[in-house]
Amino acid sequence: MSAKRRLISLQTDLIACTLITAIYHFPAYSSLEYKGTFGSINAGYADWNSGFVNTHRGEVWKVTADFGVNFKEAEFYSFYESNVLNHAVAGRNHTVSVMTHVRLFDSDMTFFGKIYGQWDNSWGDDLDMFYGFGYLGWNGEWGFFKPYIGLHNQSGDYVSAKYGQTNGWNGYVVGVTWTAVLPFTLFDEKFVLSNWNEIELDRNDAYTEQQFGRNGLNGGLTIAWKFYPRWKASVTWRYFDNKLGYDGFGDQMIYMLGYDF
C-alpha cells in the first residue's frame, strides 16, 4: 500500500472513530440540560487598505449575524456574513458557518465539528468541513478558551490546470486554533476582547496553488464596547496568511455596530 493510501486510510479510520464515539454518547443526551442562548446582528464596513498591509481591495460594506445555544452536554454556534454590499450583486459574497462541541464521557473533552461555506459571485465557491476533538475545560469569570484539532475536508469549484480540483482531503487544523473571550471594564465602560485563530496545515496541491501556500493562517482580534445594555460598537483586526486568495500576509480593519439579543 502506498504512503498516500495509508494516509487516507488513517484519516478515514480517525473520522469513523470520532463519529462512532459521538453517536454512541448521543442517546445519553436525549434530554439536554439547557444553559442559555446568545446572538447578535451587526452592520458596518471593512477596509482592506488599512492595517499593516495594503491589499488594494478597497472598502466593503457588510452585515453579519450569529446565534449560539449552550447545553451542559454540548454547544452549538452559527454565523452568517454578507459582504461587498456596496458593489453590484455580481461582486458580492456570502458566508455561513456552523460549529459544535459535544462532550465525551461527561468530560471536558469534546467531539468537534465545523462546516464553513463561502459563496462568491466573482471568485468562486467552497465548502470546508472540519472534524476532530476539542476541549471546554478552560473558562471562568475571565472568559473562555476553547481549542480544537481536526481533519480538513474541502469541496470547491477551483480547478488547477496541473493538479485538478481542490475537492477532497485538505490537510489538518492543528492545536493552535482557538476562540477566546476576555470581558473587562475600563473607565466604567464594559468591553470584550475576543480572538479566533485557525492554522491550516498540509493542504492538498490544488488548494495550495489557489491559496499560494501549503499552510495558511486565518483569524481576527476584536475589541467590542458595550455602550448600552444591548448595543455594541466593535473594531476587528482581521489577519490572514496565504488565505482568502491572497499571496502572503495580509489584513483588514472591520468597523461594526451591533445589537445583542
Where are these regions (language model features)?
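Cleavable N-terminal export/targeting peptides
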Residues: M1-G36
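Short glycine/proline- and aromatic-enriched beta-strand/turn motifs that initiate or cap beta-hairpins
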Residues: Y29-N83
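Membrane-embedded beta-strand positions of outer-membrane beta-barrel proteins
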Residues: G39-A43, F67, S78-Y80, F111-G113, ...
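Outer-membrane pore/translocation modules
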Residues: N42, H56-E59, S82-T177, Q211, ...
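Transmembrane beta-strands of outer-membrane beta-barrel pores
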Residues: Y45-N49, F71, S82-N86, I115-N121, ...
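Outer-membrane beta-barrel transmembrane domain signature
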Residues: H152-R230, Y239, Y259-F261
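Outer-membrane beta-barrel "beta-signal"
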Residues: F249-F261
